[in-house]
């Protein structure tokens, strides 16, 4: 947790430096001196909220004295993973008006992006409810946003696949081509990686599936296969490896796919295609 917070803070500071640069000219022009103020955080769309602590951290990095007071819902303070509705007050931010103005865009960028991913993930996860199939994300994330985007997937009810390349072995088409075949790639991975390291292999046809099973792959990804081809592949695997389907996954065919008994469904769309959730800071005013 400590290292995650350090990584998070490093990226937030980079984002603030990117946006503010040497100074916030507009704010310094209209607010040359300290004045205490408050502003209201409002949801402008129904969805799942995620990134509240990141939103808060943007302001406290700029000024540790900034207060972010999260609203209550049903007697409990609002938290990541909660459903929010259009017009709902999410928080009040109190502090130096210059900080509220300069941090606004960066704080909202994180909160809108993360809440959009959580909302999109939640909608897809609802289609898997009642099944044993787990929904996974991918590494198709925005550079320097992975820690935030993968967190948002979890907040929306999904699960994280590999966080980075050192987490597990995944042999994709180019790895297999470079090694000289499925069996050879698996053999080389077994010899190189720790014995506790899972080996996943991406397959595109039934011959590759057979080769991966016989070579002892732990997880076999069925990439861009039709439901009919997946059914054949699952018969071949016959429980000897975990199964993951990826590519060509739509709301229309996901129910058919889960009925095949696949263990995992992975979708890059959770992070690369989720629209933002509309959230804004409104009604900024000075207070005594």
Segments predicted by a language model, with ranges:
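C-terminal active-site rim and adjoining tail of enzyme catalytic domains
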Residues: 224, 253
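A short helix->loop->beta-strand "cap" motif at the edges of active sites that frequently abuts
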Residues: 241
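Short, charged, intrinsically disordered terminal tails
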Residues: 269-288
């Amino acid at each position: 947790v400590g290292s995650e917070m350090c990584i998070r803070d490093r990226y937030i500071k980079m984002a603030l430096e990117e946006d503010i640069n040497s100074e916030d000219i507009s704010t310094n022009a209209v607010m040359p001196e300290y004045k205490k103020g408050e502003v209201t955080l409002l949801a402008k769309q129904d969805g799942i909220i995620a990134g509240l602590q990141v939103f808060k951290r943007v302001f406290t990095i700029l000024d540790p004295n900034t207060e972010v007071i999260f609203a209550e819902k049903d007697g409990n303070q609002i938290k990541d993973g909660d459903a929010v509705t259009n017009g709902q007050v999410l928080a009040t931010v109190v502090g130096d008006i210059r900080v509220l103005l300069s941090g606004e865009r960066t704080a909202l960028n994180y909160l809108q992006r993360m809440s959009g991913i959580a909302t999109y993930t939640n909608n897809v996860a609802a289609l898997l409810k009642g099944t044993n199939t787990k929904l996974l994300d991918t590494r198709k994330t925005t550079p320097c946003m992975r820690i935030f985007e993968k967190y948002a997937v979890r907040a929306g009810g999904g699960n994280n696949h590999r966080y980075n390349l050192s987490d597990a072995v995944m042999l994709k088409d180019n790895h297999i081509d470079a090694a000289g075949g499925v069996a050879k790639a698996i053999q080389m991975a077994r010899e190189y990686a720790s014995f506790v390291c899972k080996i996943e292999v991406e397959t595109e046809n039934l011959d590759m599936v057979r080769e991966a099973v016989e070579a002892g792959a732990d997880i076999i990804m069925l990439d861009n296969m039709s439901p009919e081809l997946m059914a054949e592949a699952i018969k071949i695997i016959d429980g000897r490896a975990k199964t993951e389907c990826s590519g060509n996954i739509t709301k229309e065919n996901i129910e058919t796919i889960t009925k095949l008994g696949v263990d995992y469904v992975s979708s890059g769309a959770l992070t690369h295609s989720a629209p933002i959730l509309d959230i804004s800071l409104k009604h900024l005013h000075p207070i005594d």
